[in-house]
Each structure stands twice: as structure tokens, then as C-alpha cells.
A protein has these predicted regions:
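N-terminal presequence-like segments and the immediate start of the first folded domain
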Residues: 1-61, 65-78, 84-135
């Protein structure tokens, strides 16, 4: 379900907002989509807990689902920031990330973050997907 809260025809929220959180899954601002921190969830919005590889791939799929309503895919991602619970997982995370991101050309930052709760990983993203003509 897509809950679009509009400020204008080119600036609006994307995705169903959790009523307990003060932000939306993503926000469109012109030709860019800013994706809030996402964690590994399945299609039914249930948390996935597994290896760093499983959680990395699941988090990328979560991002893909968030941006799909705007016609965007992971190949449209231009920047990802990853928050790892433990940087000792970096090598395994990096391998899974490369597998999951495909041929996207992007910038990336990865940092250790102890505030990541009940998961090994969280990612936010910036997506470039021009608005269709006439919007």
C-alpha cells in the first residue's frame, strides 16, 4: 500500500508510514528519492535475522520494494550509506553487497553503528529517477 503524503507534485512521501515513527520509508524530491534507513525485512514486513550475507541481501531487497512504486530499481541508486553492527563483518557484507546491487554505479559509505537494534545492518539510499514528463 502506498501512502503518499504530498507537499507538491514533485515532493511527497513514498510508502506506508509506521504510525510509531516520525518519518516515511522514502521521500521524493524532484528527480531524487531519499530512502530512510531500511533493515532486512521480508515481503510481509517481518524482520529477517540471519547471517550478515542474508541480512545484506534482504536489506537491498527492502530498498528495492520501497522504490518500486516510483518505477525505480536498484540500478537507479546513486548512493548508499550502510550501518554495520560489527565491522568485522565487512568482508562478508561487501561480497553480498556486490552480489545484491548488480550493475549499479553508486557511491557508498559504510560505518560501524552500535545503535542498530535487533539487526546486523541498516542502509539508507539516494536514488536518481527523473519524474515522468508532465509531472
Amino acid at each position: 500500500m502506498n501512502d503518499k503524503t504530498r507537499k507538491s507534485s514533485t515532493h511527497y512521501a513514498i510508502g506506508k508510514k509506521n504510525p510509531n515513527l516520525p518519518f516515511h520509508p522514502a521521500v521524493r524530491a524532484g528527480d531524487f528519492i531519499f530512502v530512510s534507513g531500511q533493515v532486512p525485512k521480508d515481503e510481509n514486513n517481518n524482520m529477517i535475522s540471519g547471517t550478515i550475507e542474508e541480512e545484506t541481501l534482504a536489506t537491498l531487497k527492502t530498498i528495492a520494494r520501497v522504490i518500486a512504486d516510483e518505477g525505480a530499481t536498484l540500478s537507479d541508486v546513486v548512493r548508499i550509506t550502510t550501518y554495520l553492527e560489527d565491522t568485522r563483518d565487512f568482508g562478508r557484507y561487501n561480497k553480498a553487497f556486490l552480489e545484491g546491487i548488480g550493475d549499479a554505479v553508486l557511491a557508498r559509505t559504510t560505518v560501524e553503528a552500535k545503535a542498530v537494534i535487533n539487526t546486523k545492518i541498516e542502509m539508507d539510499a539516494v536514488v536518481y529517477k527523473p519524474l515522468p514528463s508532465g509531472k
